């Protein structure tokens, strides 16, 4: 009996330390109710639990509420020209040594920066910059794809997704789209295909999850190489990634719901035109619950902190659901407040995660996409392709006069339609 008890205690300690990642025990604080408003229905005695997460949220919340209080009489506005300066400089200078870790994310940086410029103003991506992007990408992959994170690096689904997105923003300048090796990319996608319906992100060492599926389907749609061979088993894989919360995890049956994975799954279902194959009501509930009432922005998982990037990862998922007729599930005005008040800083250009954080290219792009979603309404014809999603300004919400974006692809609507139309006019077989 003592041995069993001992094993149970040891197992509990292991779970608490190794699996739950407790760095210190949960603290209990007794609240003195003598100073509490007796008119409110409260238990005679309550204990408030403290964790690293609750302490971190308290600090963020104090910063956010202070900003809202200080700026309450000021109409929020996007400081476009300030952010443009930050983005333009990236194409003119060598990036500092502390950004060496992004060496394997070169296509991503091109997409984040170029997309941010185009979302703020469709004319802000100059022809000279487009040519620089094209030259860089075809230096990474002289054959025209698939693309790695940099020259000499392994081809990767995420890098190829970012590269195709970046090329779509270049408006086929100098005929650059004809340099894309659609046949080579198609054969590579087939080689990444797994029996369970997923895709490895990299042929040699890649993982398999919902991100890989979304990247593969987005690439294939934009290049007009989507086939039944590519989509076989994908729907079943995605359905099994929706968990009891309503959102989607990375893999079937094993993960908690996460904003990034949920976006990848939702956008993939839109591309497959199979949104009705999942529990949409639970997905709407989960998406709505990610918006924090006090902060007004989104978090990515239950009991996590607000983060500007989820303005698109969760907000974009909600916009896709809205487009397909499932209604609006979050407060767009509140999200707009969070982005404009809390993700901008007067002294530093670019957009950021939350107050106290530094701006970066990643958060600049996804905060801007989230802002575009918050200021728009979405619709589409039943059974229509997701690239035909319609976007109209929401007249009840202020406008930053951003470019209309397609929430499925994270790109301006006109660029999505332009590249898809171009390759649909090119009737050559990808296989």
UniProtKB/Swiss-Prot annotation:
GO terms for cellular component: protein farnesyltransferase complex. Optimum pH is 7.8. Catalyzes the transfer of a farnesyl moiety from farnesyl diphosphate to a cysteine at the fourth position from the C-terminus of several proteins having the C-terminal sequence Cys-aliphatic-aliphatic-X where X is Ser, Ala, Met, Cys, or Gln. Required for the membrane localization of proteins such as a-factor, Ras proteins and other membrane proteins containing the C-terminal CAAX motif. The beta subunit is responsible for isoprenoid and peptide-binding. The lineage of its organism: Eukaryota, Fungi, Dikarya, Ascomycota, Saccharomycotina. This is Protein farnesyltransferase subunit beta. Changing residue 159 to D/N: Can substitute for PGGT-I beta subunit (CDC43) in vivo. Has increased activity to farnesylate a substrate for PGGT-I. Present with 3910 molecules/cell in log phase SD medium. (2E,6E)-farnesyl diphosphate binds at residues 258-261, 301-304, 310-313.
């Amino acid at each position: 009996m003592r041995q069993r008890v001992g094993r149970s205690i040891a197992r509990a300690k292991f779970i608490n330390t190794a699996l739950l990642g407790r760095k210190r025990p949960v603290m209990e604080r007794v609240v003195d109710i003598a100073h509490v408003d007796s008119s409110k229905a409260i238990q005679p005695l309550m204990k408030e639990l403290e964790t690293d997460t609750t302490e971190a949220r308290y600090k963020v919340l104090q910063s956010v509420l202070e900003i809202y209080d200080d700026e309450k009489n000021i109409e929020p506005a996007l400081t476009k020209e300030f952010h443009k300066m930050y983005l333009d400089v990236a194409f003119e200078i060598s990036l500092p040594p502390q950004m060496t870790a992004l060496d394997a994310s070169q296509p991503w940086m091109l997409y984040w920066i170029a997309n941010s410029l185009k979302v703020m103003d469709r004319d802000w991506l100059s022809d000279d910059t487009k040519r620089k992007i094209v030259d860089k990408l075809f230096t990474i992959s002289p054959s025209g794809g698939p693309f790695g994170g940099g020259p000499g690096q392994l081809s990767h689904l995420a890098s190829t997704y970012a590269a195709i997105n970046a090329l779509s923003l270049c408006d086929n300048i100098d005929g650059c789209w004809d340099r894309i090796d659609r046949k080579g990319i198609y054969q590579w996608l087939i080689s990444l295909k797994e029996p369970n319906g997923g895709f490895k992100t990299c042929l040699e060492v890649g993982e398999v999850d919902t991100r890989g599926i979304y990247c593969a389907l987005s690439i294939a749609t934009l290049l007009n190489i989507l086939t039944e061979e590519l989509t076989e088993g994908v729907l079943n894989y995605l359905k099994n990634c929706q968990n009891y919360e309503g959102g989607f995890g990375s893999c079937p049956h094993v993960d908690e719901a996460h904003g990034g994975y949920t976006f990848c799954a939702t956008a993939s279902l839109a591309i497959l035109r199979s949104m009705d194959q999942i529990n949409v009501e639970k997905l709407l509930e989960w998406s709505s619950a990610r918006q924090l009432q006090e902060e007004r922005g989104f978090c990515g998982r239950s009991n996590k902190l607000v983060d500007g990037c989820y303005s698109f990862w969760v907000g974009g998922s909600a916009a896709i659901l809205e487009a397909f007729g499932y209604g609006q599930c979050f407060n767009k005005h509140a999200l707009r407040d969070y982005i404009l008040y809390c993700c901008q800083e007067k002294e530093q250009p670019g957009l950021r995660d939350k107050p106290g954080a530094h701006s970066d290219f990643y958060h600049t792009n996804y905060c801007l996409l989230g802002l575009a979603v918050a200021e728009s309404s979405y619709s589409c014809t039943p059974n229509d392709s997701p690239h035909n999603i319609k976007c109209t300004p929401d007249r009840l919400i202020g406008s930053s006069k951003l470019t209309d974006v397609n929430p499925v692809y994270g790109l301006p609507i006109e660029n999505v339609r332009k590249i898809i139309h171009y390759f649909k006019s090119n009737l050559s077989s990808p296989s």
